[in-house]
Amino acid sequence: MFLQDLGWSGFFAAQLHSAPDPNPDSTPAGVPGRVASANHGRFLIWTEAGTIDAGVSGTLRNSGALWPAVGDWVIVRPEDAVIDRVLNRQTCVSRKQPEREIREQVLAANIDVLFIVSGLDRDYNPRRIERFLVMANESGARPVVLLNKADLAESLGLNLTEIVASVQQLSPAITVLPISAKSDENLDALPSQLGPGQTAALIGSSGVGKSTILNRLLGDERQATGEVRASDSRGRHTTTSRQLFRMPASAANQSGWLLMDLPGLREVQLWANPDKSAGQPTQTLEASFDDIQALAASCRFRDCTHTAEPGCAVTSANLDPARLANFQKMQKELAHLERKTSPRLAKETRAKWNAIEKSVRSHPKRSS
């Protein structure tokens, strides 16, 4: 297989000589490869010469550098089956770990298109779609919303045209595709969303049909699928790990492309790269809310948080209350995350409280 067919580009090629070899005395030299799957510290790596089941070198393990994730490009030594280095990512889909500790969980690396899958049954939730759109915007991947189970729209009494239009209004620049993994409706439109050798990932809740979509596109039952409870449209976690698949060439994409199936997400907690978004969590969020971004330009204060400030054009506008509340909720999440992860803000916060404590000590409360 050729590296270009796996997503290799000049962005990664330029990094080959941008850092010293961590093992300059090792022979043979490492070769570039892409992480196709990961399982308990072992990684399946695709290279031009074939597939390698590799571990991580001690140098990389102890360096504090990037840890390999599915979709990553790495430098691997075929003879030793060891990964020496992870190349910088072009895009990165992440969330905050669903636990109290503030940590990033990388869901997918080097994704060009993020297919946000929502079922048209009881899973349909515009507020959750908004969260996924923010996640995609932060990652650098292009979001495409897939409204699955379109074949059920009529039986559920839904106006499919109106639903597509309402999702499109969430972010006018995005592509929204009604599909049916069960009947193959509109699935042939997915390959045309990517260029040759590009990579997409399927993301959404459990039971929305991600694995079924993958199987239909592959023409093979490669991923297990589960039944969905009719009472609440909830599904079981049938996909438990991340894995890349090479998709067959088609009329829409003659060179083929790659698709990653992600486990269903019960929680969509946002993550913002501290270096990328330092000092501007609101600006990062506003990019996913076109209407709010346009209104924010007319706010009286440049650093308006769109909550209680006078002269706020956002809170004064006739916005959907649920949409505005969702924006404000995510804004608080990102601001809290930045305070916890930004060294600059942590230092400023400590200085602020030190000044307050010093002031209290210098001006003790007088007894009456």
Give short role names for the model-derived ranges.
Residues 1-126:
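N-terminal accessory targeting/assembly segments
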Residues 2, 24-29, 63-80, 86-107, ...:
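Helix-rich effector regions associated with P-loop NTPase G domains
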Residues 110-118, 138-150, 171-179:
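Conserved beta-strand/loop subsegment of P-loop NTPase cores
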Residues 115-117, 201, 259:
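Structural motif
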Residues 125-126, 155-161, 269-273:
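Conserved ATPase-coupling elements of RecA-like P-loop NTPase cores
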Residues 127-142:
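Histidine-anchored nucleotide/phosphate-binding helix
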Residues 152-208:
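Canonical P-loop GTPase G-domain recognition
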Residues 210-226:
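A conserved segment at the C-terminal end of the G1
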